[in-house]
Regions:
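Extended, solvent-exposed, turn-rich assembly/linker loops in the middle of proteins
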Residues: 135-218
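Glycine/small-residue-rich hydrophobic helix-like segments
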Residues: 226-272
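Extended, compositionally biased alpha-helical segments that mediate assembly or anchoring
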Residues: 3, 266, 271-309
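N-terminal "assembly arms/tails" that initiate or stabilize quaternary assembly
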Residues: 1-83, 303
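Short helix/loop capping segments that flank catalytic or ligand/cofactor-binding pockets
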Residues: 55-58, 101, 194-197, 204, ...
Length: 309
C-alpha cells in the first residue's frame, strides 16, 4: 500500500526533472515554461527572440576629426504563442489496487502519467516542422518548395550523397546568417536508416549514454549539426534548424482549490501540474498530470527541410 505521504511539490519536481531525460525533439528548440499564469494576459504568451544589436565602423579620419560615435538601441522581437491545447493524462486509482498493489505513488502513478504527457510533445512539434519548405536541389537560392516536391533537395536511398545534402543545408542556413550554434538535423525513420547505412559516417557516430533520450536519438554530428532521429516526423522527411527557429510554450495551471493533493512546477523549459482528488461516486482517488501547450515558428529563415528520394 502507498499513500500521499510524499509532498506534492517533491513529486511534481521529480516528474518535471524526468521529462528532460525522456524527451529529444523538444530539447533542441526554444522552450518557454512557467508554473502558473500571469493574471490578466489570457492564454497567449509572448516568447522572446534573442536580443539583437548593430555594429558600426569609426574610420581613422572620423577619429582625427573627433566625430562622435552613434548609439543604437538593443532590439528584441516577441512571438505570440497561443496555449491552445491542454495535454493531460488522467487515471483512476481504484481502492483495491491502491491499497494492496500500489507500492510507490511517485514511480507508479506520477512518472507514467508524466511520460504520457511528454510523449505528445514531439507529435505536435512534428506537425509544425513539416510546414517548413526545402531548398531546390538545382538552385539553393531559388524559392523554397515542399519537401516531397520533385524539385526539392533529397537524400538518395543509397546514402551516397549524405555529405552533399548536409553541406547544402549548412550553405542555406549560412547564407541566411543563421547562428552556427545549437544547430540540429531531425529526421524521420526512413531517412535515419539511410544515414546510418553510410559507412563513411560510422566513425562519426555518437554513442548514447546514461539513458538520456536525446543522447539515444543522436545519430551523428556532421558539419556543425547534431543529427537526431525522431519517429514522430514523416519517415521520408528531414529538417535542419537552429534552436530559435521554433518555440514551445508550456504552462502549468494553478492547482484547483478543491484538489486535496497537488502542485505545479516549471524547470528547464518544461512545466507540469499534478493534482489528485477523491471521487465519492466510485469511492476511489483520481490523478491528473497536465500542462497547457502551444508551439509556433519563431523564424522560418532558421530552418530548411529536405526529403528522401
Amino acid at each position: 500500500m502507498a499513500n500521499f505521504t510524499t509532498p506534492a511539490m517533491k513529486v511534481t519536481k521529480s516528474s518535471v526533472a524526468a521529462l528532460r531525460y525522456l524527451s529529444a525533439l523538444p530539447r533542441t528548440i526554444n522552450r518557454d515554461a512557467e508554473a502558473g499564469y500571469e493574471a490578466g494576459y489570457g492564454s497567449t504568451v509572448n516568447v522572446p527572440m534573442p536580443v539583437k544589436a548593430t555594429a558600426a565602423t569609426r574610420t581613422k579620419g572620423q577619429r582625427a576629426a573627433r566625430t562622435a560615435i552613434n548609439y543604437t538601441d538593443l532590439t528584441r522581437q516577441y512571438v505570440p504563442v497561443e496555449l491552445a491545447d491542454q495535454i493531460y493524462s488522467a487515471v483512476r486509482l481504484p481502492s483495491d489496487w491502491y491499497t494492496w498493489t500500489l507500492q510507490s505513488f511517485e514511480d507508479e502513478v506520477a512518472k507514467p502519467t508524466a511520460e504520457a504527457v511528454v510523449d505528445e510533445l514531439p507529435k505536435k512539434l512534428a506537425e509544425l516542422m513539416v510546414t517548413i519548405q526545402a531548398s531546390q536541389a538545382a538552385d539553393a537560392s531559388a524559392a523554397g518548395v515542399g519537401y516531397a516536391d520533385s524539385k526539392a533537395l533529397k537524400l538518395k536511398s543509397d546514402s551516397s550523397n549524405v555529405l552533399e545534402v548536409v553541406a547544402r543545408l549548412a550553405r542555406v542556413l549560412n547564407s541566411r546568417e543563421v547562428p552556427t550554434t545549437d544547430r540540429t538535423i531531425a529526421v524521420g525513420s526512413a531517412v535515419a536508416e539511410v544515414i546510418q547505412k553510410n559507412r563513411d559516417l560510422a566513425s562519426a557516430a555518437y554513442q548514447a549514454d546514461d539513458g538520456d533520450s536525446l543522447h539515444e536519438a543522436i545519430i551523428s554530428r556532421l558539419k556543425g549539426f547534431t543529427v537526431i532521429e525522431e519517429p514522430r516526423l514523416p519517415e521520408k522527411f528531414g529538417i535542419a534548424y537552429q534552436r530559435d527557429a521554433f518555440t514551445m510554450a508550456l504552462r502549468a495551471a494553478t492547482v484547483p482549490l478543491g484538489a486535496s493533493y497537488g502542485a505545479n512546477h516549471a524547470e528547464d523549459g518544461f512545466a507540469l501540474r499534478l493534482i489528485c482528488d477523491y471521487d465519492p461516486d466510485q469511492a476511489e482517488d483520481r490523478a491528473v498530470v497536465d500542462a497547457f501547450f502551444g508551439a509556433a515558428v519563431m523564424d522560418a529563415q532558421r530552418a530548411t527541410a529536405f526529403g528522401l528520394a
